[in-house]
């Protein structure tokens, strides 16, 4: 009879230890997620982000290949609530300004601007941390 109790205790103790370790690991993961989310928040003096976008030949090839009367080498500075927002808006103001005969051109142009700004943002953030 005593041997049965020892075998039950022997099986229960590792299960209890593993359960406790799993709970600690889960709690630690939640704390890390909260810390990283706080790091992405803007402080009170960083309410707006400003981006300066200039229409280079390269940008016009990528974004405004079919834009009507593009004006190369013009720059616009726009402020927004995020880098992506400010960059997309500045790109739209420099490249997508003139109406085009192609249907939905402005929508296409705005999507291209946002796509290029996302690429730029991800490449600058990866180079920042490497």
Curated annotation (Swiss-Prot):
Q: What start and end residues bound the annotated signal peptide?
A: 1-18
- UniProt xrefs under InterPro entries: At5g64816-like
The record's keywords, sorted A to Z, are: Signal
Any one GO CC term of the record: plastid
- What name does the UniProt record give this protein? Uncharacterized protein At5g64816
Q: Which domain of life is it from?
A: Eukaryota
Specify the species.
Answer: Arabidopsis thaliana
């Amino acid at each position: 009879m005593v041997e049965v109790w020892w075998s039950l205790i022997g099986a229960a103790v590792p299960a209890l230890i593993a359960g406790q370790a799993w709970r600690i690991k889960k709690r630690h993961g939640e704390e890390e997620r909260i810390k990283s989310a706080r790091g992405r928040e803007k402080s009170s003096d960083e309410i707006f982000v400003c981006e300066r976008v200039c229409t280079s030949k390269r940008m016009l090839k990528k974004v405004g290949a079919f834009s009507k009367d593009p004006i190369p080498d013009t720059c616009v500075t726009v402020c927004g609530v995020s880098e992506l927002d400010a960059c997309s808006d500045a790109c739209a103001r420099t490249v997508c300004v003139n109406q085009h005969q192609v249907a939905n051109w402005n929508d296409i142009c705005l999507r291209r601007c946002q796509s290029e700004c996302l690429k730029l943002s991800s490449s600058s953030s990866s180079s920042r941390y490497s």
